[in-house]
Design a protein with these regions (language model features):
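Repeat-mediated protein-protein interaction surfaces in helical alpha-solenoids
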Residues: 4-20, 49-68, 89-93, 191-196
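Ankyrin-repeat boundary/"N-cap" motif
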Residues: 26-33, 57-81, 101-111, 132-153, ...
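Conserved ankyrin/ankyrin-like repeat signature
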Residues: 44, 90-91, 117-118, 161-162, ...
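Ankyrin repeat domain, specifically the short helix-to-loop turn at the C-terminus of the second helix
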Residues: 47-63, 93-101, 120-129, 167-173, ...
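Leucine-rich solenoid repeat scaffolds
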Residues: 151-167
Length: 225
C-alpha cells in the first residue's frame, strides 16, 4: 500500500521527495510559488507569474509537507489568502492591484499573520467580515455579529491586540447576547487563552467548556464555591 501511495505522489510530481528530510522539518508547502509568497519576494513573484501566465486567482497546490492546521483545513486557499496568512504585504498589494477578489475569508488569514497593516488594508477597501460557519442568522443576530468571528479567531491565535480591537470597536458589551459571550469564553478555554477569563464570566458561561476541555481542577474548584 505504501508503494502505491508513493507512486501516486511521484506521478503528481517527479521531484516530490527531493530534500525530503529538510522539507519535512520545515513543515511548509514546498512549491516554488508558495516559497516566494512566504518570503514576500515580489519581484521574483511578478516575473514568475508573468512568464508562466500563472492565474493570479488560482489556489495553491496542497503539499504533503504542510503542517499548519489552519492551512490544512482549507483545501481551497488562494494565492492572496496565502500571502495574507504570512503577512507578505508586497505580494498582497500586487495581487490586490491586479484586481484579485478580496473575499471575506481574508480577515481570518490576516489575523494569523498578526499584521496590523493588512487589517488596515481590508478596512480601507471595505472587505466584508466572515460569518460563523454552519450558524443561522438568528443565532448571532446582534449588530456587527460578523466581527465576533474575527474576535474568536484572534483569541485562537493569542493575538490579543487584535481581539481587543474587534471587541472595543465593534462588539460593545451592551450588544452582546448570551450566545456571543459563550462563543468568546468557549474559545478562550479551548485554545488556552486566558486573557478574557474572569471567575464570574466562567461561572456564567464556561462550566460546560471547562469540563469538555478537561480543566478538571478548575472545574472542581469553582464547583465548590
Amino acid at each position: 500500500k505504501m508503494k502505491t501511495v508513493k507512486n501516486e505522489l511521484l506521478n503528481k510530481s517527479s521531484n516530490i521527495f527531493d530534500n525530503y528530510d529538510m522539507k519535512r522539518e520545515e513543515g511548509e508547502n514546498d512549491s516554488h510559488i508558495c516559497s516566494m509568497i512566504r518570503n514576500d519576494s515580489v519581484e521574483e513573484f511578478i516575473s514568475y507569474v508573468t512568464r508562466s501566465n500563472y492565474s493570479l486567482s488560482s489556489q495553491i497546490t496542497p503539499s504533503i509537507y504542510e503542517t499548519n492546521s489552519f492551512i490544512l483545513e482549507r483545501k481551497d486557499t488562494t494565492l492572496i489568502e496565502y500571502s495574507a496568512f504570512f503577512g507578505s504585504i508586497q505580494i498582497f498589494q500586487y495581487l490586490m492591484m491586479k484586481g484579485v477578489e478580496l473575499a471575506a475569508s481574508l480577515w481570518l488569514y490576516v489575523i494569523h499573520s498578526n499584521s496590523a497593516e493588512l487589517i488596515h488594508m481590508l478596512e480601507t477597501h471595505h472587505v466584508l467580515q466572515p460569518k460563523f460557519e454552519n450558524k443561522s442568522e438568528t443565532e448571532f443576530n446582534r449588530p456587527n455579529h460578523e466581527y465576533l468571528r474575527c474576535l474568536t479567531e484572534s483569541i485562537k491565535c493569542h493575538h490579543n491586540d487584535f481581539a481587543d480591537y474587534f471587541e472595543n470597536n465593534f462588539l460593545f458589551q451592551e450588544e452582546k447576547d448570551p450566545k456571543q459571550k459563550e462563543a468568546i469564553i468557549a474559545n478562550c478555554i479551548k485554545y488556552h487563552n486566558y486573557y478574557y477569563l474572569e471567575t464570574e464570566t466562567i461561572k456564567e458561561h464556561g462550566f460546560f467548556y471547562l469540563h469538555l476541555y478537561k480543566y478538571n481542577e478548575l472545574f472542581n474548584l469553582l464547583l465548590k464555591e
